[in-house]
Structures are given as structure tokens and as C-alpha cells.
Amino acid sequence: METKAQTLEFLVSKVKEKKLRNGLTVLFYPYEREEVVTVKLCVKVGSSYEKESEAGITHLIEHMIFKGTETKKPEDIVGVVEALGGYMNAFTSYDYTCYYVAGPSTITEKAFDILSDVVFHPYFDPVELEREKEVVIEEMKMRLDNPFVLLFENLMKASYKKYPYRRPIIGYENTVKSFKRKDLLSFLNHFYTPKNMTLIVVGNLEEKKLFSLINKFFSSLPKRKLKKVTFPKEPYTKNPSLIWIERPVKEGYFAFTLPGASFRDEDAPYLDLLSEILGGGESSRLYIRLKRDLNLVKTIATSSFTPYGPGLFEIYGTADPQNFKEIIKEILLELEKIKLSGVSSEELNKAKTQILSDFIFSSETSEGLSSTLGSFQLIRGSYKDVLWYQKKIETATIEDLIRVSKKYFNPQKLVVSFLSEKKFFEVGELQKLIKGLDPKPS
């Protein structure tokens, strides 16, 4: 029976990497389980590359890309792909943007034709642009009807003092309204150049024929001068912060952050392990303590946000607002226990198994595997770092988790956000509560 390590080593060994003369990086994985393909063209530019006045332009470009090129009408793009049994989609993150086509293997050539055209020769029709701006603005308004979205947008703004992750990917109404066709073309010309892109193909395809098609559609794409972006150093907060959003909701929502790691940092896998131990399901420490033992929360979970830039460790859930103060106290005590006493071998081994199992499971489909390869290539610079991640998880020790928890779980850098019908306490009470913590080793 194959071990998880063997599975990942086999996966990495089968990837073919090639760089075209124009600088485009190509990753191909021969996915032989089914006659399917995922073709993903990713650009290393996300919302964090925008200036304040450009907030939302990356996302708006993503919306506009499928709206027609110099030679193709909108119906010649999505409609053609769907007629061949496939589908198209795209997403914008803080760090990169991806456009993809998925479907039967027979769709590959058409996917190359369409993606190379829409990404390099979009028309950005002014009438269509005005219509799409309204769609995006409506999307903004709908998002703010979601309590967690509202909570996290405010939390990100408070958690980052300088780094552009503090802005929502979708942008702001005033910036989106201001964009003209020339603005989109200018931004695209600064970043949409082959050496700033990765083409990922995962499918049941013959290698020689595939690279011949890639050369046909991508080798002559124009080189553009890549704009250099300098990112600010993030200072994070030096004192506990509190944001309270008052809305007529039936239950209370909470979300906390502490400084985290970049995915390029050696500590990132250890924070994933800590997240699994603290908030990964009903056997996690926070669930057992705050839900099962004390019944303070309705739901609770954690996640480690490890992007290209500085990350965050996040704890969030729902609860009766009357319990908010006690929730902060109990969460911080659980974090302090790990700093003082670590975790058990059983907890660590269970977290390792869960993370690697989820990691492998998410890479079993052609689309999932293209996402895995893409994220490692774009954030860490090489898809082969899948093996770095696997090794870091497998060899992590209790001492590693104690060291990392001491480094990142500083309650003085806690940012707390609540959403409820009314405010229950001020930031001074939060600071007093943190000052009075008395953790006891478990």
C-alpha cells in the first residue's frame, strides 16, 4: 500500500515543466484516471498589487476577460466551451489571478485558443464595462448582507496596518465606478506578460502533441515590461484592538486574528498543524473546551491564512454576545496552554494525518491538482515544494509547535471583531482582560 509520502513523490515526479522563449512557465501533469482536462492560466498579480486608487481593478479585469476580444464575441467564448461539454471560470486572490477551462480531453485545443486570446487580447468594450461595473457594485452590496463577510472585511482592515491585504479584493464602490477602459488596459499591460504567468495543464493527453499545441498558441504571445511592485513591511498592531459592528442579527458573530506567517516562511506548515489541533473539528481543543465543556459558543473554527505576504492566524465562530468576553478569555487560555505545555503526541499525529489526507484528497481531481500545483508554483516559486510541505508536516515535533506558538500567539497583538445587535464592552475592558490572564499548565 502506498504511503502519503510516496503518493506525493509520485505526483511530483510525473510533472513536466517547461519554459517557453517568451518566459511563460508551463506545468503538465498526465492525469490518466479519466478522459478529462483542466487548463489553467495564472497571472502573478492579485489585489495586493493595486494602488489604493486601483482597488478592485484586478477583480474587474477578471470579470471583463470573458466579455470579448478583438476577434471573438462573448458568445464565441463561454458558449463554445459549453457546447463542447466544458466550462470556464476565473478567480482573483490577493496574490494571483487564474482563468481556466475544464472538460473532456477533446476540449484542450479550443481551451488554448480561447485562453491565449482572452487573456492577451481582451477588448474591454466600454458599454460592457459600464454594465459589469454595476454587476460588481451590486455584488459588493450583497456581500455586506452576509455577517461573516462584513465581519472579516472589517477585521482584515484592522489586522493589517499597511499591507494591501487590508483592502477587499472586490475593491470599493468609488474606485470601481472610476475605472475606464484605458485603466484596465494599462494595468493589464503592466502585469499580463508571459514571464509573469504559469500555464497549468492536468489531463489525459499525449505529451508531444500537447507541447506542440502550447507552442502554437502561446509561444508568440507578446512580451511586456513587467511593473515592479514594492510591498510595505507590515508592523501589525502593538496593542489589543477591538472592532464592534452593530447589526440587527439573531446571533452573535466573532472573529479574532493574531499575526501569522507567509507561505514562503518555514513556520507556515506548523501553523497549519496548530490550526488543526485548536480548531479542526469536534475533537479540537477549542471545540471541546468552549462548546462541549462550557457551552459558550454555537460554532468555532480556526484557520491559518498563509499567503505570499504576511499572514494571519484566525479564530472565528458564532455565539450568544453575552458570552463574548468569556470566549476571549478561554481562547487565550487555550493558546497559552500550548505555549507552556505543548500538545500530546496523539494530537500531533492525528493533525499530521488529517492535513496530509486532506492535501492528497484535494489533489485527486484534475481541477484540484491544478490548484495545488498552481499555488506552490506561484507563491513559493516551485511546484516541487509540495514535498517540502509534506516533509515539514511529517517531521514536525512538539517542540516545533511550542516554539511557533510562542512566536505568533502574542495576546498583545490580538485583533478582535464582533458583530451583534449592540456593543457589550469597550477596548479598555479587552486590554484589562488580557492583562489579567493567568494560564496554568495542563
Q: Which residues fall in each region the model found?
A:
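N- or domain-start disorder-to-order transition segments that initiate the globular core
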Residues: T3-V36
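Residues that act as N-cap/strand-start positions at coil-to-secondary-structure junctions
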Residues: F10-V12, N239, D400
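Short acidic/glycine-enriched loop/turn segments that link adjacent beta-strands
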Residues: V12, E35, D95-Y96, K250, ...
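Short beta-strand micro-motifs in enzyme catalytic cores
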Residues: K16, T25, G252-F256, G311-F313, ...
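Charge-rich, well-structured scaffold segments of protease-associated domains
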Residues: K19, D76-L226, K233, W244, ...
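Active/ligand-binding-proximal structured segments within catalytic/core domains
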Residues: G23, E32-V81, F256, E266-L278, ...
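Short beta-turn/strand-loop junction motif enriched in small, turn-promoting residues
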Residues: T25, G46, G86, A261-S262
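His/Glu-based metal-binding/catalytic segments typifying zinc-dependent metallopeptidases
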Residues: Y31, K40-C42, L226-R285, K392, ...
